[in-house]
């Protein structure tokens, strides 16, 4: 592997899914004196708004965003990652990850893979899109038991 200096970890904010990614990121950053960056995308809930009224979708989205920020801060504090090296935004994960990787100038993106069948199921649609859209290296870490 190259000498990575900026590593972006795309988190699901699920302890079982994130643990292997965080462990791999810690291992790689310690060996290379690299900076870690964290990202999580809260998907738009426009379909909920249509079904239950716009306010319902917006309220749920705001609640999910606040909860995600809280969980992200907990993970970041455990890893000693400053607030300017973490982001939680609303939008499609694949686009937000690629955009933020470019903005931060990262040289490695770490994503989770699920190990099912076929490339789409193996990586998942977000990981697959990141793999094919990234201008830097992408490391897919196997999520056991998913």
Curated annotation (Swiss-Prot):
GO cellular component: cytoplasm
Keywords from the named record: Cytoplasm
Keyword Cytoplasm applies: yes
Localisation per UniProt entry: Cytoplasm
This protein's record includes keyword Cytoplasm: yes
Superkingdom assignment: Bacteria
GO BP annotations, alphabetical order: response to stress
InterPro entries associated with the record: Rossmann-like_a/b/a_fold, Universal_stress_UspA, UspA
Main function: Involved in stress response.
PANTHER family named among the record's database cross-references: STRESS RESPONSE PROTEIN NHAX, UNIVERSAL STRESS PROTEIN A-RELATED
Similarity section: Belongs to the universal stress protein A family.
Subunit comment: Homodimer.
Protein name as it appears in the record: Universal stress protein A homolog 2
Organism: Coxiella burnetii (strain RSA 493 / Nine Mile phase I)
Source taxonomy: Bacteria, Pseudomonadati, Pseudomonadota, Gammaproteobacteria, Legionellales
